[in-house]
Each structure stands twice: as C-alpha cells, then as structure tokens.
Amino acid sequence: PWLFRQRHGRPLVTAKIATTIDGRIAAPDGTSQWITGPDARAHAHEIRSRIDAIVVGTGTALRDNPKLTARRPDGQPYAHQPTRVVTGRRDLPADAALREGPGYLHVHSHDPAAVLAVLRDALWVLVEGGPSIIGAFADADLIDEIDHYLAPALLGAGASSVGAQRVTTLTDKRVFRRDVVTELGDDLYVRYRRQLGDGAGFRAR
C-alpha cells in the first residue's frame, strides 16, 4: 500500500463483497446475517485488522448498525483497529454502534474522491458497502482490488452486491484479474486486482 500511495497519491482501495452464487448480498426481506460461514467471516476480520480505514454508507450503517471493528473468532478485538468511516448526508443516532469508542469519522458527502481526501494519510482503505457506495467507487474508477467471499447458496432475488454504474455496453466493463483463490470452509475467497493498464489500477504492494 505504501508504494501504491507514492505512485498514485491516494490510498489503495479494496472493495469487500460477500455474495451467494447468484450475486445476492441479502434476501428479499433484507436479512443478510449470515451469507457466509464462520471461516470466511474470521478471514474478513483478519483483513480488517491490517487496514487503515473501513468505509460504509449511511444506508448500511442505519440498516445493519455494524460495529466495523476487527475481532478474533473468540470475539476479542485485534490490537489494531481501523478508523470507522460512514459516508452520506444522513446523521447516525447517538447510540449507533459505529460511534462507540475513538476512531469514528462521518464524511457528509457521497463523493468517493472527497472520502479519500479526508483519508489522505491512510495507506489501505476497505469499502464494505453497501451496493450504492461500492457502485459509486467503481464509477469514480477508485476500486483497485475486490475481496469476494462466495457462499454456495442461491437466493434468486434480493439486493445485488454492486449498485448502478455508468456502464451501457460490454466494452465499458471494468476488468480485474484473479490474484488469490482460497477455500474458507464451504465458502470461496477470491481477490481480484485491477488489470494492469486499466484505469489507475493496482501496481504494487
């Protein structure tokens, strides 16, 4: 991440999604806990323990009331905790889990570039969703990696992992290359990195 920031003048951005085989992150009634199993969730928390900041939109913050902390499988916190960032104009209630403890930021903007400007001293930023904010970062060409946790299940309907993007034809697609594939219990973890020469993209780490 340090070399990436030196070259591009901004943090490395990883988008994290957890979906069923048919690309859903929640059932039609909105339930989403849990799409993936305990091994995948433990893996995601270990990654959280190494990043500088974790970003969600106000929709996710208000709907799920997440803590966004990095916790070991036994529930104990990791020594390093990421800065918890919520983006959007709606305020969170005073008792929101995100507000507990130090390291909380609210960026009152939907602009991904504005979020990264606030986080300019960070090396590695994780965008955890929901679909609107991930779609916004994709549209802004500001996703360098995707951490995809794939659960062996079908929902058929429900929320998609990435919101609407300004892509109208196949040639507009944003291309990533598969970098890591790991089995995590019944789930599959795949890290994709932006294909070299495609946008800002990933260069080094």
Question: Which ranges hold each PLM region?
Answer:
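Enzymes that bind and transform nitrogen-containing heteroaromatic metabolites
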Residues: 3-5, 9-205
